[in-house]
């Protein structure tokens, strides 16, 4: 055992405060708030194009093809951000990666605000996509690494809540202001994240990994409070880091070694099922789904946005009590039911049956679907991904898992209209089948991680 490791075994607590009531972890709350400003920025980027589409096309005389390229560049930029964010977060720290993400988003929004033609518009969209993709990896990782095990799941779920809120706020405000003003508003959460990072500590686990032991102890002390005894947690982190440091530096092919394969399978599998269960196709084309079913589009979109935020928010307090696995199972079951109800609706419409039931069933199916997604499959894959990778492969593995997620988002959104043209009810039956497979996957492969430290989880998953 090294001297640094021996040192942290001394009781790291102010003896004058021993036995007193522990501090509230206010710095954890502040750090999480700053981090999820990035999540809100993510949602603002994702929700921008829908309310701005008509005005941008009119003001800049864009063709459908040009605006379609503008929309797709967000996902392309996000895939680049996803695959590079892991190495960046390992090199300059979690805070450094969030600063890079914020800077890309700000530059992208400024390019959109001052765009006079399609080139500046597209470059701005690509930059915001890069920032969004990087945020999607580093925010849940940072929160998981700073949060106490007792409420880590709830805090990590805030990432998904703020993404949903950002999308909904962009949609609502976008109906009231011009597209340039909406882009200007998009800068606010990015700037809040960038500035807020100066007032919070770096991830203690990253500091320990890079050998900055004094800063590691100071950051952990700041996060846990002056009255907390951090000696046990500090020793566990240091011991685990030392064990991992004896291993060679992780490369891409190392992810498929026996010691890591289960964590890779869990994370990649959850990302695949989250996306290929249909969420982005249904999310991006909700208005057209309601229109095809004969339900008022604006009313349906408002109900959709509110339900998504409310269910995700209600889910946060129970994550650390109910556990990750039960929420995933309940969520996937609800997704199957929602898809089947929507499939019945479109089957009736195609075969010209029960006309009055078609719009009702369509709305019920979509709302059951989005409510179920928000209850588990929306947030839990990110929570689990942030917990299961050892820190020596977290950058490579987490970046690749995020890339898998963004590729799935692109693939589903790209193919959705083609599938609906082929068979509207068949599309939802395919999604129902994929979500049914997700239930089997969760039961057979995914472990329960609630109430355990990251080091305990990784020891179980990667023995």
From Swiss-Prot:
Subcellular locations according to the entry: Membrane
A GO CC term attached to the entry: plant-type vacuole
Source taxon at top rank: Eukaryota
Keywords: Membrane, Sugar transport, Transmembrane, Transmembrane helix, Transport
GO biological process: zinc ion transport
Keyword Isomerase tagged: no
Topology term for the membrane: Multi-pass membrane protein
GO molecular function: sugar transmembrane transporter activity
Segments traversing the membrane: 26-46, 69-89, 103-123, 126-146, 157-177, 181-201, 264-284, 299-319, 327-347, 357-377, 396-416, 426-446
Main location: membrane
Function: Sugar transporter.
Family: Belongs to the major facilitator superfamily. Sugar transporter (TC 2.A.1.1) family.
Name of the protein described by the UniProt record: Sugar transporter ERD6-like 7
Organism: Arabidopsis thaliana (Mouse-ear cress)
């Amino acid at each position: 055992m090294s001297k640094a490791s021996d040192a942290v075994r001394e009781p790291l607590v102010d003896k004058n405060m021993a036995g007193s009531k522990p501090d509230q972890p206010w710095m954890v709350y502040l750090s999480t708030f700053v981090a999820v400003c990035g999540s809100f920025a993510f949602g603002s980027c994702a929700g921008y194009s829908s309310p701005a589409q008509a005005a941008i096309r009119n003001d800049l005389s864009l063709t459908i093809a040009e605006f379609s390229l503008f929309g797709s560049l967000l996902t392309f930029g996000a895939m680049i951000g996803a695959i590079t964010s892991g190495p960046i977060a390992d090199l300059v720290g979690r805070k450094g990666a969030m600063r890079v993400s914020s800077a890309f988003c700000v530059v992208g929004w400024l390019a959109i605000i001052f765009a006079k033609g399609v080139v500046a518009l597209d470059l701005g969209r690509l930059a915001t996509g890069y920032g969004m993709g990087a945020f999607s990896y580093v925010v849940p990782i940072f929160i998981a690494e700073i949060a106490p095990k007792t409420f880590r799941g709830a805090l990590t779920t805030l990432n998904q809540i703020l993404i949903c809120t950002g999308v909904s706020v962009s949609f609502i405000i976008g109906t009231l202001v011009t597209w340039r003003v909406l882009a200007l508003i998009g800068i606010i959460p990015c700037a809040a994240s960038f500035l807020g990072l100066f007032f919070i500590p770096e991830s203690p686990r990253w500091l320990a990994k890079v050998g900055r032991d004094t800063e590691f102890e100071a950051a952990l002390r700041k996060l846990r409070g002056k009255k907390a005894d951090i000696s046990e947690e500090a020793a566990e982190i240091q011991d685990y880091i030392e064990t991992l440091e004896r291993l060679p530096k992780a490369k891409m092919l190392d992810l498929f070694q026996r010691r890591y394969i289960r964590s890779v399978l869990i994370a990649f599998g959850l990302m695949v099922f989250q996306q290929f269960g249909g969420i982005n196709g249904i999310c991006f084309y909700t208005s057209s789904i309601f229109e095809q079913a004969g339900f008022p589009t604006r009313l349906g979109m408002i109900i959709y946005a509110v339900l998504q935020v409310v269910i995700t928010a209600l889910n946060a307090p129970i994550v650390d009590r109910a556990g990750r696995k039960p929420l995933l199972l309940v969520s996937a079951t609800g997704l199957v039911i929602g898809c089947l109800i929507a499939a019945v609706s479109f089957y009736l419409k195609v075969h010209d049956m029960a006309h009055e039931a078609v719009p009702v069933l369509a709305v019920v199916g979509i709302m059951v679907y989005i409510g179920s997604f928000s209850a588990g499959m929306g947030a839990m894959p990110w929570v689990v991904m942030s917990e299961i990778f050892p820190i020596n492969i977290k950058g490579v593995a987490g970046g690749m898992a995020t890339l898998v997620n963004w590729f799935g988002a692109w693939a589903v959104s790209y193919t959705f209209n083609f599938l609906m043209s082929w068979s509207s009810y068949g599309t939802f039956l395919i999604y129902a089948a994929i979500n049914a497979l997700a239930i089997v996957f969760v039961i057979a492969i995914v472990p329960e991680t609630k109430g355990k430290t990251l080091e305990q989880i990784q020891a179980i998953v990667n023995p």
